[in-house]
Amino acid sequence: MGNLQSEPSAGGGSRKVQPSDRAPDSRRTSLVEPEMTSQAMRLTRGLGVWFPGSATPPGLMVPREPQASPSTLPLTLERPSPVMPPPEEAAAVSAPPPAPAGTLLPGPSKWQKPAGTPVPRIRRLLEASHRGQGDPPSLRPLKPPPPPRQLSVKDTVPRAPSQFPPPLETWKPPPPLPSERQPADRRITPALATPASPPTESQAGPRNQGQTAGRARGGAPPHAGEGEMAQPADSESGLSLLCKITFKSRPSLAPPAASSSLAAKASLGGGGGGGLFAASGAISYAEVLKQGPLPPGAARPLGEVSRGAQEAEGGDGDGEGCSGPPSAPASQARALPPPPYTTFPGSKPKFDWVSAPDGPERHFRFNGAGGGIGAPRRRAAALSGPWGSPPPPPEQIHSAPGPRRPAPALLAPPTFIFPAPTNGEPMRPGPPGLQELPPLPPPTPPPTLQPPALQPTPLPVAPPLTPGLGHKESALAPTAAPALPPALAADQAPAPSPAPAPTVAEPSPPVSAPAPAAAPIKTRTRRNKGSRAARGATRKDGLHGDGPRERATATVPDSSGGGGGGSGASQTGAANTRAARHWLPFQVLNSCPCKCYCHHQPRHRRLPRNVSAWLSTSTNHLGEPPWVATIKLSGSLVAKLEHYDLQATHSN
């Protein structure tokens, strides 16, 4: 193992020259090189122990270089024999200089590439290929090698002996080496190797040395502080990425989130990131961002910070996890790290990207006119399924909303969107304004905010609350008028007064009714079928606008309940048509179910209205050559001419 890691020192260039000599017979050169510092060093080398400090001693270099390419292979070979280091150990002891090289090299020599190849890169590739096979977890991260590259010789010799004893003591488990190396690993990627062996505690001595080595290396000066942190780092094994990613904000974050000791170290800039995340196991990335601003001022108590962030954030469950002692969160963190921002399954993950989308996403969903029902159902499912179950703590949700919601009042806008998006939720916006308002404080915020699935969860509760109103609203709300409902809903949400909300809700639905695009479409087809003759006559008369518009009228009168809906609906329909129902140029408006241009219709040759208008326009066949008509027709089609459309000509 050591060979592999120390190999990077080749980058130093001192050894770069040697490889050419050594390449032909790595074994010979290794024997020749008498640079082994001491018996202890030789022994350790035989064992395959690599000391971060000993990166550049020529003695070590020999095996290293040969092994550079197969670096991991020897590792796997050596590692398996941790319990029985004797092969290497005995060999090393018996013939210290030659044996270590022999034992380590024989396999590697086969592998070794001509000296010319840049070893570090090869090693990286090899490690990538072998990684995860024999190496102890600590070896797995590729990052460690770079630091050794920066090692200085002074570290190597003095440190090798000093570190040698600890490895021997702990030698029996292969981890000791890993652990010893772990300081380096951890420094580089505190958690990349979720260290299966937390021997770091036992290895405290080596870790400190490793820390010093790291400083000497300058490999990861920022992480140098992690020497002490390494132990917490073990618990925070999964947080390596976070360390790197959050490093800038980490010092600030750690003090609030990490335990005091962690906080101090965090200021060090060492494992602080790890500390932060371990301490607040369930912190969501959003919360981290939120806390980012906090750092300038204060290290708030861990519990307070996470809880405040969560409350602002809408995470009820997180608070518990975060406030817990770092150790507990650390365990969670170990599970968590893969998605650093998610929380452990138990906790409701209030990602702020979940809560924030509540506003925009709401709008988007509503505009998309995804079924009112579909939207809420989808949201609830998404949260409950993969992320953990928000549903279980609906009560908590309600209670939490009280404190949490007030701040995010800015999310209120989505509220009016709510009525629109769903039959399920629309009940909410209207009735919640109505009934939840009586339970004033918490419920009022929900209407305003209703950001997370939290509301959707209570949603089930809400429907019972106002069954009558809810149903009415849901019926009306399929697509609340985009514009009006927002204004109305805004009134609803902000104004707790129950009356305004219901009244507003009721008026809005009629307005919105013309809008319902999805449902009416199907209805339209049927209705058209039923009264097709009559309608066809109407159209022939040119009573109404183009097909879509008339259809809107027809639909609207039902919801508006007005025969007079015809004209009024016409306008609404016009808006609808303009917005949603662009008829494609040749789409058949009221065609037979077959959608064919055929005589099934009372008015036969039912081409798209603009086409039929052109065709039916009185043409002076003598005066206007056919190509003129063609041009006009094609122009209208290309432009999808609304204005040329029957709106103008259609009276014929």
UniProtKB/Swiss-Prot annotation:
Compositional bias segments (type: Basic and acidic residues): 18-30, 124-133, 538-552
GO biological process: cell differentiation; double-strand break repair; gamete generation; spermatogenesis
Region (Disordered): 1-39, 52-237, 251-273, 291-473, 488-576
Keyword terms, alphabetized: Developmental protein, Differentiation, Phosphoprotein, Spermatogenesis
TM region(s), chain numbering: none
Record's compositionally biased regions (Polar residues): 201-212
Renumbered residue ranges of the record's region Interactions with ZNF403/GGNBP2 and OAZ3: 491-652
Bias-annotated ranges (Pro residues): 138-149, 163-178, 428-466, 495-513
Composition bias, Basic residues: 523-532
Biased composition regions of type Low complexity, renumbered to the chain: 213-230, 251-267, 299-312, 407-422
Modification Phosphoserine occurs at: S389
Region called Interaction with GGNBP1, residue ranges: 123-486
InterPro entries: GGN (IPR031400)
GO MF terms, alphabetically ordered: ubiquitin protein ligase binding
Assembly with partners or alone: Interacts with FANCL, GGNBP1 and ZNF403/GGNBP2.
Gene encoding the protein: GGN
SS bonds (residue pairs): none
Pathology noted in the entry: Spermatogenic failure 69: An autosomal recessive male infertility disorder characterized by low sperm concentrations, globozoospermia, and absence of sperm acrosome.
Function in brief: May be involved in spermatogenesis.
Name of the molecule in the record: Gametogenetin
Source organism superkingdom: Eukaryota
